Amino acid sequence: MRFTGLKYLQLLACLGLFACGSAERYDVVIVGGGASGTAAGLQAARMGARTLIVEEFDWLGGMLTSAGVSATDGNYRLRGGIWDEFRTELARHYGCDSALITGWVSNVMFEPSVGDSIFKRLVAREPNLTVWYRSAAETAERGKDVWRLGVRRDGRLRQVEAGVLVDATELGDVARIDRKSTRLNSSHP
C-alpha cells in the first residue's frame, strides 16, 4: 500500500486521536497540595483509593510549610491522625518535642523546608498516591458519574478522570473553572 501525502496525514491524525483520547483514571483527584490537600491525599490513598494530587509548585504543605508561617497552633495533647505523624516527624528531625518550642508564637515551630520534606516522605510511602508537581487544572467538567479534568503538566494538557474531585486550592481554582457544578457564593437565588 502506497501512502500519499493526504493518506499519510489522515493516518497521523487518527493515531494522534487515539494517543490523546485516553484519560488517566483515578478514584480521587485533589487539586492543591497544601496542608489540607496533602492530608486528604494521604487519607484517601490509605483507604485504598487510587489518588492524584495536582500541585502548582514543587512544594507540599502550602502556607503551613512556606512563606515564613511555619509556626502552628499545634497541641501536643492532640495525638493521632496525620497531624500527629507530621508533628512526630518534626520532633524526630529536631531531636525531641521540646526542640519545637522555640518561640512565643507557637508550640510547634519548624523550618519551611523541613515541613516540605516531611510531607514528601509521607506521600512517597503511599503506593496509591501520585503527586504531579508544577501542574495546574485548566478545565473541569462534571459528567454523570465522573469528573473530567484537563491538567497542564510538562507543557502538555493531560486528560484525567475521577469519581471524586477535591478543590484544596487556596483560592477555589476549580470552582472558578467549573461554574456549572459549583456555587461561587453563599447567596441563594
Where are these regions (language model features)?
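Bacterial Sec-dependent signal peptides at the C-terminal "C-region" and cleavage site
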Residues: 13-25
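Beta1/beta-strand and adjacent pyrophosphate-binding region of the FAD-binding site
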Residues: 24-34
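Core beta-strand elements of the Rossmann-like FAD/NAD(P) dinucleotide-binding domain
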Residues: 26, 155-164
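N-terminal Rossmann-fold NAD(P) dinucleotide-binding loop
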Residues: 37
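Conserved N-terminal/central alpha/beta ligand/cofactor-binding core
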Residues: 43, 49-50, 55-139, 143, ...
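Conserved beta-strand-loop-beta-strand element in the redox core of flavoprotein oxidoreductases
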Residues: 141-159
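Flavin (primarily FAD) binding-site architecture
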Residues: 167-179
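Single conserved hydrophobic/aromatic residue that forms the stacking wall/gate
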Residues: 180, 184-189
